[in-house]
Each structure stands twice: as C-alpha cells, then as structure tokens.
C-alpha cells in the first residue's frame, strides 16, 4: 500500500501511551500512517492533545466525550472555546451520546452535546461525534440543530445498515475502525460498506481501543487492557 494514511481518531493521551508518544508515532509512520487526529475527551485531554498536535504537526479536537458529560460545568464552554481557537485544533469533540452504559445520564449528555453544537457553530469547526445505542436521538438532534451536516464525522460507526443510510442521507461523514476486521463483532459492516461514498468515508483506529485482532501482528498484551491497539494497525483497517 503506497498511499499515505490518516488515522482520524487516536487517543494519544490515554494512560497506556504515557511516555511512549514518540515511539507510537514513529511506529505509525513506518507503517504508512503519515498523519493523525488526536482526540480530546475532556478539558484536560483537550489541552494535552492541542499541545501534542502542535509538537508533532498533527491536528487535534477538543470536547467532552459523553462518558465525561457529567463533568461539564459553567466554565466548560468558555474553556473549550479557548482551546478551539488554537491553530492545530480543527474540530469540536469527541462529543455526542452513549446510552450503552450511561456513565453520564442521558439528560446531561443531551445538554452537553447541544453545547458542543453551539461551539461548532460559533467557531465554524466540524463536529467529531460519538454515538452508541443512541441513533434515533442523535439523528433527531443533528437534523434539528445542525446547519451543515457535511462538517460532521460520526466516528467509530458500528450500527445497522438502516442507521448508516439515514446518517448518509443527512450528509455526514462516517468513520470505520478495526471492528470491520473482526468477524465476531464487525462482519455486518463489510456487508454494506460499499454504500458509503468514497468522499464520505474515513478510517481510524480509535487506539488504544478496538484492536483489529489481526493475525499477522498480534496486538501487545498489557495489564491495562487485553489488546492494545495502536495507530500503526490502521493499515489493517484500510485493507479490509
């Protein structure tokens, strides 16, 4: 594979990568991954990825993951706005709705997500969205509140064919991860990936999560998580 790859979701501030950032990036470069989007999931990580993006000439996002929506306070909007004005920060997020485990209540998630939409409108930046087990609510919010759906990425899509069609009808972009490599959980994605237009499709690792379970390179086993995913494995997602 000669074309250089871009990993649109790397959680480089995760504890399992601490102190290894340059090694992770170097290994990715050797495996044809030229650029990364470093994702913020709360205020602290958003600050860190903005600095890392500047250091390594990548781009970053700033936002509150729905799991962390409960940590939103009266200062969060202005604090994020300040980060979003930095040169290397190019999207609002990771933000959205996750009703799978509800680490934050659905009501709080909805409210905080609407704040992120307001931030995207104020800064004219794209939205980087996380949605799990919340398709109907997410679709409704996007349809009612977002003006330019072409500036939305629904990352780590693992839903149904009907959900995918409805998202594409809105005009959003879709991100696919290593789930597509795994017959145990992602086989259904390969059955309808061809309906995603080339100009609406992104690939990502969402590392260190969602290992593609590749046979040629066994992911490193750590005490923190059973399978440590890395940006260097993006090539496996691209192959599938």
Language-model features: locations:
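Mid-domain alpha/beta scaffold segments of enzyme catalytic cores
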Residues: 1-240
